[in-house]
Amino acid sequence: MANPRSNRKKVKKQVVDAVAHIHASFNNTIVTITDRQGNALSWATAGGSGFRGSRKSTPFAAQVASERAATAAAEYGVKNVDVLVKGPGPGRESAVRALNAAGFRVQSITDATPVPHNGCRPPKKRRV
């Protein structure tokens, strides 16, 4: 006999304050929206949003990825967002603007780009 409780919908927890982690590398942009404890609510990438190759690293691709993560996080009732930006990529600015345009109140923007104290040797300079 079937389990009588199988038709119950899973209730999504309501999170009002969230943290948007934006990892903007030179090749891609990853947007993850978490609660204050760091549990992921939603995420999106520029590559997963339909952009491939060099189009992944554009500001528009970062904007689309940010919008997709924002719509998924809105189902959890997210209203206020602290933004944590990491990396030197071209999608930094546009991803933050897209979160603001999605209806979230951006409370703070923090740059958490890791800066080496002369650690690993950087990649060689490009000769085009």
From Swiss-Prot:
Record keyword Ribosomal protein present: yes
Keywords per UniProt: Ribonucleoprotein, Ribosomal protein, RNA-binding, rRNA-binding
Pfam families: Ribosomal_S11
Domain of life of the source: Bacteria
Any one biological process term the GO annotation gives: translation
InterPro entries: Ribosomal_uS11, Ribosomal_uS11_bac-type, Ribosomal_uS11_CS, Ribosomal_uS11_sf
One GO location term (cellular component): ribosome
GO molecular function, one term: structural constituent of ribosome
Homology family: Belongs to the universal ribosomal protein uS11 family.
Function: Located on the platform of the 30S subunit, it bridges several disparate RNA helices of the 16S rRNA. Forms part of the Shine-Dalgarno cleft in the 70S ribosome.
Subunit and interaction comment: Part of the 30S ribosomal subunit. Interacts with proteins S7 and S18. Binds to IF-3.
Protein's UniProt name: Small ribosomal subunit protein uS11
Organism: Chromohalobacter salexigens (strain ATCC BAA-138 / DSM 3043 / CIP 106854 / NCIMB 13768 / 1H11)
Upper taxonomic lineage: Bacteria, Pseudomonadati, Pseudomonadota, Gammaproteobacteria, Oceanospirillales
Gene from which the chain derives: rpsK
